[in-house]
C-alpha cells in the first residue's frame, strides 16, 4: 500500500508496464482476456494502487503496531519491526525496485535494509522450500508466469498452491511457503470447471484471498 509503484514502473521498467491505476492489481495479467475472468467490482476495495502512506499508517495504528518508544520505528509485541529486502546482485531493475520498497518502509516507520547476494547463493536459498527461509530473506523478489495457454490458472497455482511447500528444490513458485486449504481446493477444481460463471466466481474468490492475505504482492506487470 505504501510502495511507490509509479517510480518502480518509471525507473525499473522504463515505463514499459501498465500502472496499477490503469490495471488494478489482481492475479491476472493486464490483457483484456485475463482481466475479464474475474469480477473487479467484488474486490475493488482491496485493490490498492500504492503511495498511500497515510492509509498504511492508519492500518498499522489500527492493528496496534505503533512506535511506543519514540525512536521512529514501530514495534509489534515489543519487538522493533526490522527486515532485510533482497534480490540478486547485478539485477539492476530488481535492485531499483527493492530500494523503492525499502524507502516505503521507512516512510511508515518500518526499518527495511537492502542486501544483494550473488545469484548462485540467492537461488539456492529461495528455491529450498523444505525449511524456513533464513535470516536476511524477509522480503525477496522472484518472478511469476506471463501469458500462456494454461493462464491464469498456472500463474495462480504457482503463487498460492501449498503443493510446493516442502520441496527441497522448488523452481515452481510459492517461495514464501504460503498455505491456505480454501485456495488449494479452488486451484485443484479449476482445470475441470467448464461453466463460465463458475470459473469467474472461482477466480474472483482467489483474487479476494490473495489481496486479503497478501502472501506476496506484485511490484510491476
Annotate the PLM regions.
Residues 76-79, 131-135, 181, 210-212:
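Extracellular/periplasmic catalytic domains that process cell-envelope and extracellular macromolecules
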Residues 99-108, 121-137:
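Short helices/loops that flank or line small-molecule/ion binding pockets
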Residues 1-103, 174-179, 198, 205:
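Append "and occasionally in soluble cytosolic enzymes with long acidic Gly/Pro-rich linkers
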Residues 5-8, 80-82, 107-111, 134-139, ...:
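Loop/turn elements at helix/coil->beta-strand transitions in domains of secreted/extracellular proteins
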Residues 1, 9-10, 19-21, 49, ...:
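Extracytoplasmic/peripheral linker and loop segments enriched in polar/acidic and small residues
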Residues 117, 137-156:
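Ligand-binding clamshell of periplasmic/extracellular solute-binding protein-like
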Residues 36-46, 127-133, 166-170:
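Surface-exposed intrinsically disordered loops and tails
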Residues 12, 87-89, 116-118, 141-145, ...:
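Active-site proximal loops enriched in glycine and acidic residues that flank catalytic Cys/His/Asp
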